[in-house]
């Protein structure tokens, strides 16, 4: 039996309230569950009463192989009960070909400008030394 720690919606229309429950993955979202281990009231401002967790029971179910859903994993991560893996930046977020070409051209122009500035700074420093020698 595969178990999930997930949200079960309660509350009235446009006034959501969620129970954090341990349920079989095949059970309906708001239906049969094994145990209620917390609650989440998104209507409250961000404070300690917004998310309530029974830490002892959550640790028990995590040790027994229950997998939290994404939203519940966020709550557990904030409470320090589970570690949420860092998401890698997908390839889609990388700049396109033209943008990369523009970046490379900008870097090259910046390096050339820096080299020219260094050469200009070095040339006047050498000139007075030659005048002083003559």
Swiss-Prot record:
GO molecular function: structural constituent of ribosome
InterPro entries according to UniProt: Ribosomal_bS16, Ribosomal_bS16_dom_sf
Any one cellular-component term (Gene Ontology): small ribosomal subunit
Residue ranges with Low complexity bias: 116-134
Gene3D superfamilies: 3.30.1320.10
Keywords: Ribonucleoprotein, Ribosomal protein
Keyword Cytoplasm listed: no
Superkingdom classification of source: Bacteria
Family: Belongs to the bacterial ribosomal protein bS16 family.
Protein name: Small ribosomal subunit protein bS16
Biological source species: Chelativorans sp. (strain BNC1)
Taxonomic lineage: Bacteria, Pseudomonadati, Pseudomonadota, Alphaproteobacteria, Hyphomicrobiales
Gene transcribed to yield this protein: rpsP
């Amino acid at each position: 039996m595969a178990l999930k720690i997930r949200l079960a919606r309660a509350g009235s229309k446009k006034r959501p309230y969620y129970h954090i429950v341990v349920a079989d993955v095949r059970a309906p979202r708001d239906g049969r569950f094994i145990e209620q281990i917390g609650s989440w009231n998104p209507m409250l401002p961000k404070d300690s009463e917004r998310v309530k967790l029974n830490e002892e029971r959550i640790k028990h179910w995590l040790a027994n192989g229950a997998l939290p859903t994404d939203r519940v994993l966020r709550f557990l991560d904030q409470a320090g009960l589970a570690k949420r893996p860092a998401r890698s930046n997908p390839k889609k977020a990388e700049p396109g070909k033209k943008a990369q070409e523009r970046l490379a051209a900008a870097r090259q122009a910046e390096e050339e400008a820096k080299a020219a500035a260094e050469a200009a700074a070095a040339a006047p420093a050498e000139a007075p030394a030659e005048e002083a020698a003559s």
